[in-house]
Curated annotation (Swiss-Prot):
SUPFAM superfamilies: ATP-dependent DNA ligase DNA-binding domain (SSF117018), DNA ligase/mRNA capping enzyme, catalytic domain (SSF56091), Nucleic acid-binding proteins (SSF50249). The lineage of its organism: Archaea, Thermoproteota, Thermoprotei, Sulfolobales, Sulfolobaceae. The keyword Magnesium applies. Keywords: ATP-binding, Cell cycle, Cell division, DNA damage, DNA recombination, DNA repair, DNA replication, Ligase, Magnesium, Metal-binding, Nucleotide-binding. It comes from the Archaea. It comes from Saccharolobus shibatae (strain ATCC 51178 / DSM 5389 / JCM 8931 / NBRC 15437 / B12) (Sulfolobus shibatae). PROSITE patterns: DNA_LIGASE_A1, DNA_LIGASE_A2, DNA_LIGASE_A3. This is DNA ligase. GO terms for molecular function: ATP binding; DNA binding; DNA ligase (ATP) activity; metal ion binding. Optimum pH is 6.0-7.0. Optimum temperature is 60-80 degrees Celsius. Its cofactor is Mg(2+); Ca(2+); Mn(2+). It catalyses: ATP + (deoxyribonucleotide)n-3'-hydroxyl + 5'-phospho-(deoxyribonucleotide)m = (deoxyribonucleotide)n+m + AMP + diphosphate.
Length: 601
């Protein structure tokens, strides 16, 4: 399969803003792709060489390296490449222009012929894999040579998207949800197969793997798919409510209640003597927690399992729980074994999804928890999450306050009974979180995605000082603007922010972003931040839940303030528009005269 086919589709996709059109065009590309390498095609569409959970290196090519490779491939001096980059802001476009110029001025271009061999997807994939995996002395020069070699063989359009792929900025506006729908259309007979494909992806979060199974065995093979150790399951997510009475009513009057820990959610896999740890974002974080690997190996019985819990920093002296920030300090230390001594952790397990070749995601919570409790040996490091069973509001409140006093964030209220299955990848009422932040006027903090930036004034003149934030709408696979946040940042954070955002700025709005407000710069929807505010208000300036509460208006956060970055969350893990609406409906309402100026921006 020629790489040119993918490049041509990327060129079309880049110019489309309609999700329906994106999905249809992507389905067309998938249906025309070589079935033998369909997994590689899917990974390339995702902008990666392999799933994040494998823990393999990323391409790791900086701007200077790319400029050097483009210079070599197009026989252009580096200064000229840099100047063109300054004027376009897009190295992919630079490569396209220089390759076009090279073709038109060459003798073969003059004659209107070409002897160039076609660049294949296999060649691109294998060469870029070498680039990513090459390490050691001389690796820098080898990476540049390999990349320059690809660019030499590429035509202008191929060069454009090769460079963008290496940069990690394809800019074609495709999320995983769109790929899933396209796969259902291309291989499953239509949109009706989306649920089957999505269920499979929820159990095995590897789109390339799912695509390969479909083309080799058919859509029916996905219906009986089980979790596989080593491939993470998409985590089950909780709804949120602030009223204990309503929570108990939602779960049927009786529930299992766990502490909600202020740590890092972890999915732990074991197969024989190998143990893998995956983050909430399904990234392989095994190397960050060699102590947890040792604890699981020693204290959890079984040859093959997938379990879930929270890794929590604890005081080495008292054993009391520390805040989430302590884990972040640990991650920043270069010597992991020194970090283990300074920031020890405990693991609090709360679920089991797979055990000795049996899929437990379809079994009730009580069955899963009973088995989990039976396989954990008594020890000081790996424990079952603190929990009780409640059937009245008083016990729920009492346990909630206890969790807070012991350093937790609140509690997780979980439905029990035969229907209380593990809903992989879904947010539903089987789990409901009650956090201490609910005591404020705005019921909870929210996790929002950065989609734009605004320049400041005075000492922040010419630098980013506030951000346009958006919530995720899973129904449309888009990000809808919620607020403009300018407070809560330190000067150091703002300086760091400037650097981070300049690397992913865009000339035009991302096709997955829905915003009336025009920031000074548009940003790729990559970073997630935790935000708190005074209340959620109706706003004509924002698109979150547009026309749902009031015609021609959306919902916004009044007086928003930055709390922290949520590096453990992907953009699709951000607070959803439905959750924002739910929070708005639950908060106390005050009748205010219609203001001429909206304060929520």
């Amino acid at each position: 399969m020629e790489f040119k086919v993918i490049a041509e589709y990327f060129d079309k996709l880049e110019k489309i803003s309609s999700r329906l059109q994106l999905t249809a065009l992507l389905a067309d590309l998938l249906s025309k792709s070589d079935k033998a390498i369909i997994d590689k095609v899917v990974y390339i569409i995702q902008g990666k060489l392999w799933p994040d959970f494998l823990g393999y290196p990323e391409l790791g090519i900086g701007e200077k390296f790319l400029i050097k490779a483009i210079s070599i491939a197009t026989n252009t001096d580096e200064n000229s490449v840099e100047n063109l980059y300054k004027s376009t802001g897009d190295l992919g476009e630079v490569a396209r222009r220089l390759k076009s110029k090279q073709q038109s001025t060459g003798i073969l271009g003059f004659l209107g012929t070409s002897s160039k061999e076609s660049l294949t997807v296999d060649e691109v994939y294998s060469t870029l894999s070498k680039v990513a995996l090459t390490t050691g002395e001389g690796s820098r020069d080898l990476k540049i040579r390999l990349l320059a070699g690809l660019l030499k063989k590429a035509d202008p359009l191929e060069a454009k998207f090769l460079v963008r792929f290496v940069e990690g900025r394809l800019r074609v506006g495709i999320g995983d949800a769109t790929v899933l729908d396209a796969m259902a259309i291309a291989f499953g007979g239509g949109q009706s197969a989306s649920e089957i494909v999505e269920r499979a992806y929820n159990l095995r979060a590897d789109l390339g793997n799912i695509a390969k199974i479909i083309v080799e065995k058919g859509i029916e093979a996905l219906k009986t798919l089980k979790p596989e150790v080593g491939i993470p399951i998409r985590p089950m997510l909780a709804e949120r409510l602030s009223n204990p009475e309503e929570i108990l009513k939602k779960v049927g009057g009786s529930a299992l209640v766990d502490y909600k820990y202020d740590g890092e959610r972890a999915q732990i896999h074991k197969k024989s003597d190998k143990i893998f740890i995956f983050s909430r974002r399904l990234e392989n974080i095994t190397s960050q927690y060699p102590d947890v690997v040792e604890y699981i190996s020693k204290y959890v019985e079984g040859k093959e399992f997938i379990i879930e819990g929270e890794i929590v920093a604890v005081d080495p002296e008292s054993g009391e729980m520390r805040a989430f920030q302590e884990l972040m300090h640990r991650k920043r230390k270069s010597d992991i074994y020194e970090a283990i001594k300074e920031y020890p952790v405990n693991v609090f397990l709360f679920d089991l999804m797979y055990y000795e070749d049996v899929d437990y995601t379809t079994k009730p919570l009580e069955v899963r928890r009973k088995l989990l409790e039976s396989i954990v040996k008594p020890n000081d490091y790996v424990k079952i999450a603190h929990h009780i069973q409640v059937n009245n509001v008083e016990d729920l409140k009492s346990f909630f306050y206890r969790a807070i006093s012991e350093g937790g964030e609140g509690v997780m209220v979980k439905a029990i009974g035969k229907d209380a299955i593990y809903q992989a990848g879904a947010r539903g009422w089987l789990w409901i979180k009650l956090k201490r932040d609910y005591q404020s006027e705005m019921a909870d903090t929210v996790d929002l995605v950065v989609v734009g930036g605004f320049y400041g004034k005075g000492k922040r003149g010419g630098k980013i000082s506030s951000l346009l934030m958006a919530a995720y709408n899973p129904k449309t696979d888009t990000f809808e603007s919620v607020c403009k946040v300018a407070s809560g940042f330190s000067d150091e954070q703002l300086d760091e922010l400037q650097k981070k955002l300049m690397e992913i700025k865009r000339d035009i709005k991302h096709p997955r972003v829905n915003s009336k407000m025009e920031p000074d710069i548009w940003i790729e929807p990559v970073y997630v931040a935790e935000i708190i505010g005074a209340e959620i208000t109706i706003s004509p300036l924002h698109t979150c839940c547009q026309d749902v509460v009031e015609k021609d208006a959306g919902l916004s956060i009044r007086f928003p303030r930055f709390i922290r970055w949520r590096d453990d969350k992907s953009p699709e893990d951000a607070t959803t528009t439905d959750e924002i609406l739910e929070m708005y409906n639950k908060q106390p309402k005050k009748k205010i005269e219609s203001p001429l100026v909206d304060e929520s921006v």
